[in-house]
Amino acid sequence: MRIFNLEEPLIYSYFRSGFYSFISRDMVLLQKITDRSGVCLKVFFNPLIGDIKDYNWGHPFLVASNNMAPRSERARLIDAVIIQNLCAWHGLAPRVYEIVGLSWEGKIYPALIVDDLGEASDMVEWDQRVKIMEAIKKIGDKYGFYTEYEDLGQARNFIKDKFVDFQAFKLKPDYRDQVIKRYKAKAKWSENTYQTVPELGIGGYRDNERRLELMQLNKLDFTGKSVLDIGCSGGFYCRYAKDRGASRVLGVDLQNVADAAFEVSNYLGYYDINYSGMKLEPNLDYNFGFSIDIIFYLSVYRYFGYAPFLKKAKMIIYEHNGDVPEEEAIKQFSKDFPKHWEVAITGRDTGSNDDRRTLIFAKE
């Protein structure tokens, strides 16, 4: 978690804040923390004690247990963020991009960088609140989260047809297992799980940790770069780019695959990686909405050729499919993109029966 020192206390409206958090739109602080537009900070009143993984959002809610004895429940902040982003993926909540810490007078206060929906209103109709909550509960049934306290009485928790207060939501005990199961079912190539997810013990057709070593990507600088991964599969290289300091990352694949990549990344805490489910057509140009520094173009040439949008990148990390000799791949790329020069990085990619050499094409 990144920590930022406050130079002065944040100002908030007592009448517009919640019991446990408030919204800050302090532009000086936001510009210090993020380059994203259209976001605000949701700052929590209770300081952090111990690990952020153990930080709870809000107060305990009394709910009935199976033996009719009441018990208290409240959500861990990181679980609530996972749930909120699952709802955001379906258009039912503002998206959380990062959990940061704000340091003031020796204490650290957790805060969320989140989509700014504007001011809340007390005029949201009851039927509309019920409609939104029912949609969220269906999403919970699909993924594996729940609430026993819907809090429909607070109209201000519903802004622009989205719900903003997930302090009473919890993940089901088997959620991790369900994430793994869904990933294996969706992030596939042929009949195989394609990319490994070491953090979850998921193996795959391509040993990505070994591939990183062979591709020698550690020699490249990702700091502050915007990265596009075409055919991102399970999002392994998207997460790698973020770990290496990339400022913005977008992974593109078929919708079902993008769903799996998003859920795994969200569960692992990579909240700010964007995923897009779309079917790219060969020889068509696409505007991905941002200036691209680096494109991962791994084993997708046979589907798209040298797509026109590759020209927009400053660097292309390219792996051919093994169906053409390396020299032919370089020759064809040089013909299509004469303003580029190439550096070959040698090595055999595991999981393949051929030598697939990864090439770096970089603009002069």
Where do the PLM segments sit?
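ATP-binding glycine-rich loop module of kinase domains
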Residues: 29-77
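Conserved HxN/HPN-centered segment at the entrance to the catalytic loop
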Residues: 89-99
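Conserved alpha-helix/loop element of class I SAM-dependent methyltransferases that forms part
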Residues: 205-222
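Conserved kinase catalytic-core helix
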Residues: 83-91, 120-162
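ATP-binding glycine-rich phosphate-binding loop
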Residues: 3-35, 43-45
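Conserved beta-strand signature within the Rossmann-like core of class I S-adenosyl-L-methionine
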Residues: 313-325
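Conserved structural core of kinase catalytic domains
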Residues: 97-132
